[in-house]
């Protein structure tokens, strides 16, 4: 539960799911505070509870249903929002209300207006709002030194394993000036790292035909390359980082490489490749193919040798043969992907992949995921070992009695590795959370680094 305090009436808040859902939660909490509601850190201290759910995979659905049940048991007045709110069961009934019929209201994701309307219905807003208590950057649920910057909502792809478009809709890009203003407010508030997120960052502006916008009196196209360039220029004025997530490997990404090579944005790409064998990609209804992607990765690294590539994959997709899986293992080794995650395929209710023949047993899916991660860890370990002896710029996330924990440009929060920093040997070398420090790397394993200032 999130804890921000001021005055009553009081709303409890539970936020589940991905960074896109976290941004939705931040927007709702910001509006609640602007209208004078207090955010309670406990169920018992709240007049009602809002639960922002995730509905992407079965485990997330169960976690969300459990959270709703806990909120109902502890408080009794619950409003539900998020991706699970848009899902229905096989009979066409809302999943949430079929399990928890006593919830006050249910909305889908990215539904600020509907959530606030439900709150107003069941907990009238105060007469005197406290909009002056809400900072220009809004209320954030991340640490003060980094923040997620969502540039669009929804997705135009129809991947067979995914139901996100049915929950979040087609691509809707935010106006470029609106994105830039939010970024500026975050940087002015002391944010040291902007994490650009969406369902498909490469497609930013496609829905508005790359419409020309304006920022600070200058024309700025609603397009990934132009937006990233402007964000990098803005962040450099504050000595901050810009990190790109959910970037499809389209040719347009080539245009961003010079910006990374020049240091305007971090040399880091989060590219969700999912597989490498063309037949599996076809069954997944995924764009691109492994050979072209491998050529593109090589070209990117020629322009930006320091580039870190993170990706996610699915092992054990329906119909995946041992030969197809071996192609995937060969690909991650040849591509030398720096950071990877792998999920054993799990059927998602409503996904068209459920109708594909050749479903694999659970033990085969898990065994392939484990084999994948063994190869991936060896690749990662080789790359991290090459960093030993080098000095890296590290953003400190926390400080404790054992020293500090931070991240290099190659590490996004929560999903990548960490840099463990020895306690400062001299007073002038002290650091705190949110500081950038130069760390000499003294050790590495398959995931993390160790070093000293």
UniProtKB/Swiss-Prot annotation:
EC number(s) recorded for this UniProt protein: 2.8.4.4
Pfam families, A to Z: Radical_SAM, TRAM_2, UPF0004
Major localisation: cytoplasm
Binding-site positions, [4Fe-4S] cluster 1: 18, 54, 83
Localization per Swiss-Prot or TrEMBL: Cytoplasm
Cofactor note: Binds 2 [4Fe-4S] clusters. One cluster is coordinated with 3 cysteines and an exchangeable S-adenosyl-L-methionine.
Binding site for [4Fe-4S] cluster 2: 155, 159, 162
UniProt xrefs under SMART domains: Elp3
Residues in TRAM domain copies: 385-453
SUPFAM superfamilies: Radical SAM enzymes (SSF102114)
Function: Catalyzes the methylthiolation of an aspartic acid residue of ribosomal protein uS12.
Protein name per UniProt: Ribosomal protein uS12 methylthiotransferase RimO
Annotated organism of origin: Ralstonia pickettii (strain 12J)
Lineage of source species: Bacteria, Pseudomonadati, Pseudomonadota, Betaproteobacteria, Burkholderiales
